[in-house]
Design a protein with these regions (language model features):
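Membrane-embedded and interfacial regions of multi-pass energy-transducing membrane proteins
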Residues: 1-93, 97-410
């Protein structure tokens, strides 16, 4: 067996890659529970890919057959109901773990030098994940799927000069139709998963090149023993692979509880209107995107005044796009001499809490019908969201920091 392994490794460096990225990749020994979510996102990605493949086998990507094929999967395909619930719940779980993964990066400065590229790859994954979720949202061909996609695609029409042509190009028709469904199906099932997997590989390669951050924001490569091994590092395998099994068990317990007992999640994962087939002549009472898009939808609706002769709808789209785009430049906005929130001053801590609260409340506001009071609150929270980033070069520089230890703490 060893000869076979050596023969393969001489031609395809499997063992070398395993050692570099697992058994001889030294990670900081003080990881806490916030570092579970990267591994959990990989687990959910595998779930989405596998369940997606099996669902595709019975799905009919046509306006005439899409809704009926979903009902067929739910009623007649053996364990089809389980596959669908695993996939729909997995989509929400994916965004839960990704948002927590991103928040951990914000807390511990995982975007700062030398991990700028790791952060950019991660944000690109987030962007592709949003596109993947949006494309997949149309596929059930229910009322909310149809009208939600209609609203989002029509937003591109607010762009001056090219807006209408861009909307037409995305739809492939003058209205959302079977043509739109077919191209969204192709993108959701083939194109975007390939891009997503490639970005995940790049994200991990970039991470393992510069090394993992830790709750203290200390570079463990600066303290090595006589063998060149970081004193505060432990091999990722077997220590953190076993460590992550605990998180996987807890996660699967909660995940399966949702799948088997609350798969609709009160209408947040599977909306009530989506149990009706798409009807272009009947508009739902309230159109809202899936919960993981609602913070940006709330920002879009918060803009109620046109500027420079351009309508409020256009500026809402600009604000929504800027809310995502500004995350990409975060590594160059933070001027703090320390990485971790543990050693930053009160201004940075209050700012991060205000940012997190504003994002969560915006998520709620985007999911409910708009009222004048809620619109005003959304405007205030949108201001707080952007202030966190725009003012960061100033408050991160003047904030009083604590001394950072030379080695990691417990």
């Amino acid at each position: 067996m060893q000869k076979l392994i050596d023969w393969v490794d001489a031609r395809l460096p499997v063992v070398t890659a395993y050692e570099k990225h697992m058994s001889k990749y030294y990670a900081p020994k003080n990881f806490n529970f916030m570092y579970f979510f990267g591994s959990l996102s990989m687990l959910v990605l595998v779930n989405q890919l596998l369940t997606g493949i099996w669902l595709t086998m019975s799905y009919n990507p046509s306006a005439e057959g899409a809704f009926a094929s979903i009902e067929y999967i739910m009623r007649d395909v053996e364990y089809g109901w389980l596959l669908r619930y695993l996939h729909s719940t997995g989509a929400s779980a994916f965004f839960v773990v990704v948002y927590l993964h991103m928040f951990r990066g914000l807390m511990y400065g995982s975007y700062q030098k030398p991990r700028e590229l790791v952060w950019i790859f991660g944000m690109t994954i987030y962007l592709v994940l949003m596109a993947e979720a949006f494309m997949g949202y149309l596929l059930p061909w229910g009322q909310m799927s149809y009208w939600g996609a209609q609203v989002i695609i029509n937003l591109f029409g607010a762009i001056p000069v090219v807006g209408e042509d861009l909307s037409l190009w995305i739809r492939g028709d003058y209205l959302i139709s079977g043509v739109t469904l077919n191209r969204f199906f192709a993108l959701h099932v083939v194109a975007l998963p390939i891009v997503l997997l490639a970005l995940v590989v790049l994200h991990l390669l970039a991470l393992h090149e510069v090394g993992s951050n830790n709750p203290d924001g200390v570079d463990i490569k600066k303290n090595k023993d006589e063998n060149g091994i970081p004193k505060d590092g432990i091999p990722f395998h077997p220590y953190y692979t076993v460590h992550d099994i605990v998180a996987v068990v807890v996660f699967l317990f909660v995940f399966c509880a949702v799948v088997f007992f609350f798969p609709e999640m009160g209408g947040y994962a599977l909306e009530k209107p989506n149990f009706e087939p798409a009807n272009p002549l009947k508009t739902p009472e309230h159109i809202a995107p899936v919960w993981y898009f609602t913070p940006y939808y709330a920002m879009l609706r918060a803009v109620t005044v046109g500027i420079l002769g351009l309508p409020a709808k256009f500026w809402g789209v600009v604000v929504m796009g800027a809310a995502i785009a500004i995350l990409f430049v975060l590594p160059w906005l933070d001027r703090s001499p320390v990485k971790s929130i543990r050693y930053k001053g009160w201004i940075s801590k209050v700012s991060l809490i205000a940012f997190a609260v504003s994002f969560v409340v915006l998520g709620y506001l985007g999911a409910v019908p708009s009222t004048p009071g809620k619109t005003t609150l959304a405007q205030i929270l949108t201001f707080i969201y952007f202030a966190f980033f725009i003012l960061m070069p100033w408050y991160s520089r003047i904030d009083k920091t604590k001394p950072v230890p030379e080695r990691v703490t417990g």
